[in-house]
Swiss-Prot record:
Name recorded for this polypeptide: 7-cyano-7-deazaguanine synthase
GO MF, one annotated term: ligase activity, forming carbon-nitrogen bonds
Source species: Salmonella heidelberg (strain SL476)
EC class: ligase
Residue numbers binding Zn(2+): 188, 197, 200, 203
Keywords: ATP-binding, Ligase, Metal-binding, Nucleotide-binding, Queuosine biosynthesis, Zinc
Textual note on the cofactor: Binds 1 zinc ion per subunit.
InterPro entries hit by this protein: QueC (IPR018317), Rossmann-like_a/b/a_fold (IPR014729)
Catalytic reaction annotation: 7-carboxy-7-deazaguanine + NH4(+) + ATP = 7-cyano-7-deazaguanine + ADP + phosphate + H2O + H(+)
Length: 231
């Protein structure tokens, strides 16, 4: 039996990964993390989506220690979430240091226990928000370290790594979940479901990608299939 664990926030990217995993694996588990995030409404959204999409199990893990260690606008109400700046340089203040290191490591430990062969994460470096822990080289390096540390071959899968946001919408549509992802996921840094606040970087990337996909469906779908190998 093929099993996978999805690092699941209830946002656009991880929900698209979950929709695909349900078709590619016999048994899918989800792991969601409560780190005291500003947009922690995503936890309830993740619970509802995991139930709706039919996962084998959904674990919500308390990692609020991260909130004490990692200072970010996503972990401190006193630090405002910045409006989207398309030409901004450097790492944004929404970056939570160590977040994906911790999430992927804990997901791999869970995968070890349930005998899953893969941990799936929705990170992407094509049009990402400047986070160093979304890069392909980081995921591969951590995957190697985790496998050495557990003497186990658990594969970190990144289905969205080389596709952009428009193509991510196409992937959701390919699996018949475009409306669900559009209406029921929570991507917004300010914790607003669906189209979100419309001001933060997450909302702008999401909206721009959706608009591009809806305006160029055939071309974007073809590009997504070419990059992912789907037919």
């Amino acid at each position: 039996m093929k099993r996978a664990v999805v690092v699941f926030s209830g946002g656009q990217d991880s929900t698209t990964c979950l929709a695909q995993a349900r078709h590619q694996y016999d048994e899918v588990h989800c792991v969601t993390f409560d780190y005291g995030q500003r947009h922690r409404a995503e936890i309830d959204v993740a619970r509802a989506l995991a139930l709706k999409l039919g996962t084998r199990a959904h674990k919500v893990l308390d990692v609020t220690l991260l909130n004490e260690l990692a200072v970010s606008s996503l972990t401190r109400d006193s630090i405002p979430v910045p409006d989207y700046e398309p030409n901004a340089d450097g790492i944004p203040n929404t970056f939570v240091p160590g977040r994906n290191i911790l999430f992927l490591t804990l997901a791999a430990i869970y995968a070890y226990q349930v005998k899953a062969e893969a941990v799936i994460t929705g990170v992407c470096e094509t049009d990402f928000s400047g986070y160093p822990d979304c890069r392909d080289e980081f995921v591969k390096a951590l995957n190697h370290a985790v496998n050495l540390g557990m003497a186990k071959d658990i594969r970190f899968e990144t289905p969205l790594m080389w596709i952009d946001k428009a193509e991510t919408w196409a992937l959701a549509d390919y699996w018949g979940q475009l409306d669900l992802v559009r209406e029921e996921t929570l991507t917004c840094y300010n914790g607003i479901k669906g189209d979100g606040c419309g001001h933060c970087a997450a909302c702008n990337l999401r909206a721009n990608g959706l608009n591009h996909y809806l305006s160029n469906k055939a071309a974007v779908m073809a590009a997504m299939k070419q990059k992912t190998g789907l037919r």
